[in-house]
């Protein structure tokens, strides 16, 4: 099973790239984890936000292909680390790849939300999108460590 983090936005600060990469490289070969960056639509004074969201959503769904789509969204379901580990095991048993979608400043398009099989809430707080990349990478790595009895996670 491959996991993709499909996120709107490019040109992240170095600390984001380093933080994400620190956890991405720890994933086992049989469960590769990759980042797919989607260019953000140009937002200006008279920007057509619904159209921008639609275009970003189309690109995200195209990148996801036939993967199980899981949106990261505040109204999604909050999972504890242990619950995320259970989800990870369920996804592995399902056999499909997983695409985790992170929207841009205005969130996800209605099409992305409609295509999602699950929605995951990292927090009721609004988090900066660059930080979400690092949090998701660490959370998934920690969940994997639970499923394999790796010593990274401690109770």
Curated annotation (Swiss-Prot):
Enzyme's top EC category: transferase
Residues reported to bind S-adenosyl-L-methionine: 72, 103, 122-127
Lineage here is: Bacteria, Pseudomonadati, Pseudomonadota, Gammaproteobacteria, Aeromonadales
Q: Name one Pfam family in it.
A: SPOUT_MTase
Name one molecular function that GO assigns to this entry: rRNA (pseudouridine-N3-)-methyltransferase activity
Supply the HAMAP family for this chain: 23SrRNA_methyltr_H
**Any one cellular component term from GO for this entry?**
cytoplasm
Where is it mainly found?
cytoplasm
Q: What is this protein called?
A: Ribosomal RNA large subunit methyltransferase H
Organism field: Aeromonas hydrophila subsp. hydrophila (strain ATCC 7966 / DSM 30187 / BCRC 13018 / CCUG 14551 / JCM 1027 / KCTC 2358 / NCIMB 9240 / NCTC 8049)
CDD domains with a match to the protein in the record: RlmH-like
Record bears the keyword Ribonucleoprotein:
no
Family matches, as InterPro entries: Alpha/beta_knot_MTases, RlmH-like, tRNA_m1G_MTases_N
Enzyme Commission code(s) on record: 2.1.1.177
Family stated for the protein in its record: Belongs to the RNA methyltransferase RlmH family.
Location of the protein in the cell: Cytoplasm
- Alphabetic keyword roster: Cytoplasm, Methyltransferase, rRNA processing, S-adenosyl-L-methionine, Transferase
* Physiological role: Specifically methylates the pseudouridine at position 1915 (m3Psi1915) in 23S rRNA.
Q: How does it assemble?
A: Homodimer.
Q: Which reaction does it catalyse?
A: pseudouridine(1915) in 23S rRNA + S-adenosyl-L-methionine = N(3)-methylpseudouridine(1915) in 23S rRNA + S-adenosyl-L-homocysteine + H(+)
